């Protein structure tokens, strides 16, 4: 599981270690500069942890399995290791994972039949509002179901190979097809529910993985999913990835934001 490998990497690595084996886009391409202004880099201390999505000046949405402590975020980044004057740094004042996510699964490093990774969402409240600019912009939540067969864009930082973990400093994008959930249910022993989306290429070669977790899945121009879990090595044939289906959670997201002004 992607996030189990992420947890092990963080457990074994030091705070100031190089970025762990976690995030990657397989079979993708370098995103056009500033084309994903809502994409957020979530850090634990100085170590890249996960992706995220800016929903409004005060709130970032990411995956619950990215839960940790001492967060900070970078907004408007294209390259994680270059000084970019347009980028913004913020600390996180509060992390609110979805109450339905089973946190105990983060500590289990083996796969079991019918494990349920539902509700893999977490809201991060920024200590200071983001400044909305050409390079830092929020993205709205979906109002309708995504259509099967849609072309979806996922993005993230990290290795661009499925097994050698050759990291890229730049934000990478990949086009994925929205597939029937039955395809993911056949591929994985874990539970696939109607609160999840299935996306990838059945022929293999294109995928998201590990610390790409928490990043956006944008289908036909609309934010529809958050990268959650899948098979390792990533990009294998008949092994599409699984994403949290956001239109099932818009009420929880909006209510949580309203209750924590």
UniProtKB/Swiss-Prot annotation:
Keywords: Disulfide bond, Glycoprotein, Growth factor, Hydrolase, Metal-binding, Protease, Serine protease, Signal, Zinc, Zymogen. It comes from Mus musculus. The lineage of its organism: Eukaryota, Metazoa, Chordata, Craniata, Vertebrata. The gene is Klk1b3. Residues 19-24 form a propeptide. It catalyses: Preferential cleavage of Arg-|-Xaa bonds in small molecule substrates. Highly selective action to release kallidin (lysyl-bradykinin) from kininogen involves hydrolysis of Met-|-Xaa or Leu-|-Xaa. The active site is at residues 65, 120, 213. It holds the Pfam family Trypsin. GO terms for molecular function: growth factor activity; metal ion binding; serine-type endopeptidase activity. Residues 1-18 form the signal peptide. SUPFAM superfamilies: Trypsin-like serine proteases. Its cofactor is Zn(2+). Binds 2 Zn(2+) ions per 7S complex. The Zn(2+) ions are bound at the alpha-gamma interfaces. This is Kallikrein 1-related peptidase b3.
